[in-house]
Every structure is written in structure tokens, then in C-alpha cells.
């Protein structure tokens, strides 16, 4: 009888803890939890299956939060170019730098491949300013979504590959945008952004980007969520289309 009472008490405590956890997830706090998870993935301090389960669990709460905050729907055809206030840009390897072979999101900071595009700005002296305007080049969100992870602490000597970064969950297109090598991060986890909102400034942060051969650029990727598993997707067509529209609008 005593043992049965113990089991009953234990069951009640587990139910209560589960309810408390769900209440936490039902608020904007879920972005803070995602940010914490993101750093555990990068540092390799969490099991892959556990990380995948948590991402799958967090996503519905992020989507709900986005809708509660009246986030705007932005289709792929409405994506905007991720840079603003620049004189000229060019793509690494003319946009042929996307490689997703052997890539796995849960490899953390030691991911293989390059499932992204690098966009260089005009900065020959590498002072992080556009050589013509003498001003920083803004990074803007390509779509709408919720900021779920950032890094603002990177410093020289850090082994973090992407340096300072921003990750935004695109609710409309069920995917994750990753912007990295940022010099100044302008958003925080929990922020709801629209297409064109400033999220940072182009830089050279990161364990390789900061080295002498490194160029001032933005590294940007888009990953479709498949039940919590971020799978990279080639998006050069959408990127060039957005660039073309940006150039037309700035004439």
C-alpha cells in the first residue's frame, strides 16, 4: 500500500512538472530555450536525438508565438535581399559555393560542406565599412519570423566557426535562416521581425573569416524543417531575384 502511494505521488509530481514546462513553452520564453539548445548543439554538449526532439517540440510554440504577435506572412516570392546600404556586392564563386554533401546541422560548429551563400561587400581595406560610403552595410531579414538564436559574445581566439550570428525561424515557409560573420547583432531571441528589418551589420567574425585572407561578407543559409530536423535548401534563385528587386527599388 505504501509503495502504491509513493507511485501515485510520483505520478502527480510528474504531471505537475509537465504542465509547468508546457506553460513555459507557451510563452515567448521558448525562444530563450531554443537559444540555449542552439549553443548546446554548437558546443557538442547535447545528444543529437535529444536535440532533434527538442527542436521538434519547440517549433509549434514558436509558430504560436509568431501568430500571437501578429507576425506577417511573407512568401518566398516576397523575400528581400539580405543586404542594404551597399555600393556593390559579389557572390563567392559567382553563387556556385553551395555544397550540402555530408552536411548535418547537428554537427554543431564542425559542420561539413557549405550549404549556404557568401555575399562579399566592397571593403578592400577590411575596416568593416563600405569603401565608397564609409559606412557599415546593414544585414536585413530576408523573410518574417522569430529570432530563435544569436551570438553576440564572439571574440578573437574563439573557435566558433560562424562568429556572431542570428537564426530566424521563418514560420510561413517552415524553415530556419542562418546569418553569420556579423560584426554587430541588432536583435535578440524572441524578437519578431518582418522582411527587411535590420538584424545586424556585415563583418568578419569567425575563426577563419577573421584571418588575413578573410573578406568582409555575409554567410546566409536556409534550412527546411523536417519534423525538427533542419535540412539545407539551395536558394540562389530566390537570392538573385531578391537582389534584382532590391536594385530596381534603389534606382
What is each residue range found by the language model?
Residues 159-168, 191-251:
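Conserved, short, structured surface segments that act as functional micro-motifs
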Residues 22-138, 238-251:
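Polar/charged, compositionally biased leader and regulatory segments
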Residues 138-150, 187-202:
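Short, well-structured beta-strand-loop connectors
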Residues 9-10, 20:
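Cleavable N-terminal signal peptides
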Residues 133-136, 140-183, 213-217:
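Zn2+-dependent peptidoglycan hydrolase active-site motif and core
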Residues 117-131, 175, 180-182, 222-232:
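Small beta-barrel nucleic-acid-binding modules, principally OB-folds
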Amino acid at each position: 500500500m505504501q509503495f502504491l502511494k509513493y507511485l501515485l505521488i510520483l505520478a502527480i509530481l510528474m504531471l505537475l512538472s509537465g504542465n509547468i514546462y508546457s506553460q513555459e513553452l507557451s510563452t515567448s520564453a521558448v525562444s530563450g530555450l531554443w537559444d540555449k539548445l542552439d549553443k548546446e548543439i554548437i558546443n557538442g554538449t547535447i545528444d543529437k536525438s535529444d536535440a532533434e526532439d527538442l527542436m521538434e517540440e519547440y517549433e509549434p510554440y514558436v509558430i504560436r508565438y509568431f501568430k500571437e504577435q501578429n507576425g506577417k506572412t511573407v512568401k518566398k516570392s516576397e523575400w528581400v535581399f539580405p543586404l542594404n546600404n551597399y555600393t556593390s556586392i559579389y557572390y563567392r564563386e559567382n553563387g556556385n559555393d553551395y555544397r550540402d554533401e555530408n552536411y548535418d546541422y547537428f554537427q554543431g560548429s564542425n559542420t561539413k560542406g557549405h550549404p549556404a551563400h557568401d555575399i562579399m561587400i566592397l571593403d578592400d581595406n577590411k575596416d568593416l565599412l563600405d569603401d565608397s560610403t564609409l559606412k557599415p552595410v546593414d544585414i536585413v531579414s530576408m523573410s518574417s519570423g522569430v529570432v530563435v538564436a544569436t551570438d553576440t559574445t564572439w571574440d578573437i581566439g574563439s573557435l566558433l566557426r560562424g562568429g556572431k550570428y542570428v537564426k530566424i525561424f521563418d514560420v510561413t515557409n517552415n524553415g530556419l535562416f542562418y546569418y553569420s560573420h556579423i560584426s554587430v547583432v541588432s536583435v535578440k531571441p524572441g524578437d519578431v521581425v518582418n522582411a527587411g528589418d535590420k538584424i545586424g551589420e556585415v563583418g568578419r567574425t569567425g575563426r577563419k573569416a577573421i584571418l588575413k585572407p578573410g573578406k568582409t561578407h555575409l554567410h546566409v543559409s536556409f534550412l527546411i524543417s523536417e519534423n525538427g530536423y533542419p535540412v539545407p535548401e539551395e536558394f540562389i534563385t530566390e537570392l538573385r531575384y531578391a537582389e534584382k528587386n532590391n536594385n530596381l527599388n534603389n534606382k
